[in-house]
A protein has these predicted regions:
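Short, Lys/Arg-rich, polar N-terminal cytosolic tail immediately upstream
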Residues: 1-9
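Membrane-interface capping segments at transmembrane-helix boundaries
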Residues: 6, 65-71, 123-133, 326-343
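Alpha-helical transmembrane spans of integral membrane proteins, capturing the lipid-embedded, hydrophobic core
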Residues: 12, 16-24, 28, 49-57, ...
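Alpha-helical transmembrane segments of multi-pass membrane proteins
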Residues: 19-35, 91-93, 160-166, 331
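Alpha-helical transmembrane segments in multi-pass membrane proteins
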Residues: 31-128, 146-150, 176-193, 310-323
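Central hydrophobic cores of alpha-helical transmembrane segments
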Residues: 77-86, 226-233, 282-292
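Membrane-interface helix/loop boundary segments of multi-pass membrane proteins
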Residues: 157, 203-231, 272-279
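C-terminal membrane module of polytopic membrane proteins
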Residues: 249-256, 280-281, 286-343
Length: 343
């Protein structure tokens, strides 16, 4: 058992070193080349957080090959190959030249790869043998499929209520008008786009944090301590982005504190979802819902006047999400995850 724990720690630390080094180095390079975010470089800085999101899964995949993971089946390698193809092309199109132009701000060629990847994952679920090949790497859609409805609807409702509280309490105002109908219409359109075009970036975070890191932290620390540490790591990973003015503009210190509160609260929900289903895809779906709510909520519900002390992704919003998270912590799914010392 000592050797197993030592191996888990080794895989964990190598993953964290790659993920943090790549993310922080990218931010440093973009800052040195483009400076702080302005109207002239808004596209690059807007896409850089998307690029960040690809690093955790990339680090996880590198570690899986380096440490010769048994989860690297043929089907898994196909998905990983498409993910890396997207990542390489996305970086080239973002920081060098968009080969086929753009869809809005998104590079077109890498978007085509994203659609191809989505269709490939779908097709790999059509045969039992292929699904079996995806299961060890948690790329199979999983079990307890009712949670694909229950949890996304629940988190959407909780966050929507939190966002509306920003408007009701005067902590925020919409950039256009308060209109829930237009919010829903815009959100649905963005979700449709996100599922096909943005899933690789969300997968990038969730496969790294909720699969690779989670599968190593929980056996070492147990479910409760593991999910807390995972949330803290996830929050700290956002530090350079916040220092450079994203997420919580003008709040480099309090912004990082608010982010860590938020990632702990949301991280519990995402980890619970993966533990209940055995699949990364439910975490991808929930994360995508949270991200896709941002633009329509700012337009038709409220933009926070003070991003830290507010509902939504602010501290007040994190408290509301935390109430839901604490309810999930009562589940038995968190128990018996730690390696037994006596074995």
């Amino acid at each position: 058992m000592f050797l197993e724990k030592r191996q888990l720690k080794k895989e964990l630390f190598v993953f964290l070193i790659i993920t943090f080094a790549a993310t922080y180095l990218l931010d440093f390079m973009v800052y040195m080349i483009y400076g702080l975010k302005t109207t002239s470089n808004a596209t690059v800085w807007g896409l850089t957080p998307v690029a960040h999101m690809l690093f955790p899964a990339a680090a996880a995949i590198i570690c899986m090959f380096y440490f010769k993971s048994s989860a690297l089946t043929r089907e898994t390698k196909i998905v990983f190959a498409l993910f890396f193809s997207y990542m390489v092309l996305f970086f080239f199109e973002t920081y060098v030249y968009p080969i086929m132009g753009t869809i809005g701000v998104l590079p077109l060629a890498s978007s085509v790869i994203a659609i191809l990847g989505f269709l490939t994952v779908f097709m790999l679920h059509l045969k039992k043998q292929w699904r079996r090949g995806l299961k060890p790497s948690r790329l199979f859609i999983g079990k307890n499929l009712r949670y694909y409805i229950i949890l996304p609807v629940a988190i959407f409702t909780v966050i929507l209520a939190s966002l509306i509280l920003n408007y009701i309490t005067g902590l925020g105002v919409p950039s256009q008008e308060f209109n829930l109908y237009l919010f829903f219409v815009t959100f649905i359109n963005m979700m449709f786009m996100g599922i096909f075009l943005l899933w690789p970036s969300v997968f990038g975070e969730e496969y790294g944090w909720r699969v690779y890191l989670q599968d190593r932290l929980f056996p070492l620390l147990g479910g409760y301590r593991g999910v807390l540490v995972l949330g803290i790591i996830w929050g700290i990973w956002h530090t350079p982005t916040i220092l450079l003015g994203n997420n919580f503009p003008g709040q480099p210190i309090l912004g990082n504190v608010a982010m860590i509160f938020f990632t702990i609260a949301v991280g519990i929900i995402l980890s619970y979802a993966v533990l209940k289903t055995g699949s990364v895809w439910i975490a991808v779906l929930i994360h995508l819902i949270i991200d896709m709510m941002q633009v329509p909520s700012e337009t038709y519900i409220a933009i926070s006047i003070h991003p830290v002390f507010s509902f939504g992704s602010g501290i007040y919003g994190s408290v509301i999400i935390a109430v839901f998270s604490i309810i999930l912590l009562r589940s038995k799914v968190w128990k018996n995850l730690k390696i037994r010392e006596s074995n």
